[in-house]
């Protein structure tokens, strides 16, 4: 009898423990992805940062100084997908924001889906291409679908990743109109951003925006006193065809996203209703302002960091006041890459050159025509991937593997090409040195030949209008990450941490299951 009673009490204690653990879960999870955030910049600016923004994360959170995504050629969407799913593009299906569509023979969003209609946009998107669950999805499952899950980002693909499959809403800024946009995939979009489109549209505010130094006349690190005193000034003209792109690369987009986030927290009751956990995921930008073509970008970039620091302080203060700091789990991570403007190679006599996509495709097609007869053998070039015409190869009864290998061997001889691989090369487990490439591609959307370019070379995609320039720079900059919440002690982790370890770690903190494609073990935190 005593044994039975003892067993019952142990079991009851276990049940109560589980209940207490569930009740002590955070009421609100706030996830922030900062595109191109660099550790060296926040460390260099530490003395100028406010106590309530980045410094609060650095001093009171778990501070990862180097998050490695382990894949080349990332962007905001693919990096967010790796961090949210704990899996690489090969598994999660998001190798980049744009993919080649063989039907239209053009680039489309990785999340293009004609099944749904756009809200305030002609774009038709859904998360159906995201093939695995996310950390956010698992929160929804653990809370039996009761969680409110919202995401806001300048970028459509990133907003969709951050909302996951179970998202209540996802909003982004339309590249053509500057409107806050969404998809009918999301059934309960908040009215705040919809009202902004009517009451305070971006197009009506652009002419009033003037970007000048936040601390004019004060010294900025590595900026001469003459530059600091003269400052800088950028305006946004509605007549500029690139005005929305410029806006989305300026600190103003971060401030607008912060204001929207604050309205969500105060107006939607996030983290205040019942015993469930709500989610608010945000995307911020710290990429180089597009107006620059050389090393003169550092003044503006440092200023963008200081402005984002103020935005974070404003957001954190709202969370403290509305939800309570002990009720919030907050994480902020860099996307782990940095796109620098091209250095003036001619002035400094540095190695480099220009790789013309149009010329390369034309030469490759001429080479294949000489071997196999007339036809357009190349369908498209996109981000280092060359897509051969499957229809033409089938029509001519050609072996696609052989043609891809011949194309690879032809392209690798071109100036500026460091190496070339077929999809079969990369997919072969026997080729160990291609492991990073293997992780980075989705075989369902990858090209037949993938090119690597020499550092210092500019890839000019002049096969489409307007042409797109991509500077090939292999220098790596550490990107930081932070996790802050009740029960986590401040600590600094200097060792490199793989991005795929973060979702399992966050899942352990939340005491929920990891995303279904995450195989890494959770990190042990204090």
What does each model-identified segment do?
Residues 359-398, 467-510:
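Substrate-binding rim/cap in mid-to-C-terminal beta-strand-loop elements of soluble/periplasmic
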Residues 41, 247-273, 287-328, 406, ...:
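A long, amphipathic alpha-helix that forms part
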Residues 88, 96-276, 285-292, 415, ...:
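His/Asp/Glu-rich, glycine-adjacent segments
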Residues 43-92, 148-152:
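Short, structured active-site-proximal loop/turn typified by the sulfatase FGly-forming signature C/S-X-P-X-R
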Residues 1-25:
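Bacterial Sec-dependent N-terminal signal peptides
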Residues 38-44, 67-69, 121-127, 244-251, ...:
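Second-shell loop/turn segments in exported
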Residues 65-82, 151-160, 283-285, 334-336, ...:
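Short, solvent-exposed turn/loop segments enriched in Gly/Ser/Thr/Pro and often Arg
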Residues 75, 97-123, 132, 137, ...:
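Secreted, luminal/periplasmic, and some membrane-associated catalytic domains
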